[in-house]
């Protein structure tokens, strides 16, 4: 029996016409709309029945499997929650409840959710008190995965292994954005029970907003070397994440990763959150930090940062400051047209080795710079010159270059990260990098005492510092930056993409002989890469040989996720070494290395590592063929 249609002139009939056939391109979009819609009408609805997309066979094949995380359901029936109606009479047949309902279905094109049917005529008046008591914003999103009350309660707190297991037990559906991240954290705790992890969920939604973590070994490293901290932030990573890494500088002048923070794009006050979480994880370092070098965003959070680190000088990374200044000049319309030499003048300003040199460069900027940009510079950067000019730098008297340390870490980071847009895969890569950095404690130092960690940075000492000074004075910072210059890694990303087509980072295991052949090929590539004494990969392998008890076996496979379970004896070494040929090609493409330089490095490194004659001849032959 068909239900009677309400008269078109009534309010309910008009609302039904407006709601029917309305489309939504994600379940989260529908949930936000429905929360506001219910609040306007004081209406209470709950999910009576539903069909999850994970049960549809056609949705499990790529690329349609992404629909599971976005649309979540193929069918949902929402009915009115008439709280005053008796649930079931003691005697007699059950009484009919409120007839109001809404049906949402997947569209025939399978790209959106559509309201196909609705009846908004209720059998009871609306009650504001009942609505205020029973209504829970975001309850539709909670039904998709986790209860909102649970995520709101645990958000912004450090979680223990038991908390992660409890969250996994609460999960109701296959929301891979949450499930995969929780599985990675569960594996991390299984491998390192002393790790520190803080989770932040979007308010009233079961959506991960921020993850902060550090392992027990990097926390010990931070407590050992807290004097100088560096912050490397990569906004818009893969177009889907913001990444912030806190580095410490060890006794040999190497930048070592201490903690990481992964967040949704545009998350406010990420630096303050990361520093506060870091100090909560290691409170004894608060009064021992003497210098913090971060990006230009630190200026907007300066009072909070100084409150967190009262004994530290706060600096702006000169390289990032220069890019920010030049981008602002382009925005104001002066760079390249009114003043084509602006980039060189900015480099001389930032690299001034004395107050006199700074005043001279500033006078030149006033004389030749665009008026709008000079006014902006005087208001925003000149009062803070102690934070970004070289002669006032904290590390200048210690023969260190914070900018070079940050650049070196960023290169290593971009080589390690796979081109995945998910939080879970990013966490896997970052945990692997922290383990690799921790393994560097056992790496023998090179002749210059710098070890393999500053492979691409100018040498320390007077000669290296003089080279950096000459580069600043001549404006040789790799050329004027263009839009998106921070992401000069197109070649690297292409190589990673090709590698992913065969490795299948999305979760598929290696299949039969094809997978084993790929492993053997990558292992051989790793053997050739091992002949580079100044490379990060070689340092990790040597360190891993000395620390087999910490870095091998099923413990490492646990947190790496199910897609790597087929690798029986690889451990962390296999993770770090796979694709090293691709990474080396990407690094040469990024930094301008030539094949001839790489071949000379291979020959020199073979003598340092005392490799076998067989390995040397094979490496030389392969490099000659490539060339």
UniProtKB/Swiss-Prot annotation:
Sequence segments annotated as region (Disordered): 441-466, 608-627
Keywords noted in UniProt: Isopeptide bond, Ubl conjugation
Keyword Cell membrane belongs to the record: no
Taxonomic lineage of the native organism: Eukaryota, Metazoa, Chordata, Craniata, Vertebrata
Keyword Ubl conjugation part of the UniProt annotation: yes
UniProt superkingdom: Eukaryota
Species per Swiss-Prot/TrEMBL record: Homo sapiens
Name of the featured protein: Uncharacterized protein ZSWIM9
Compositionally skewed regions (Basic and acidic residues) per UniProt: 615-627
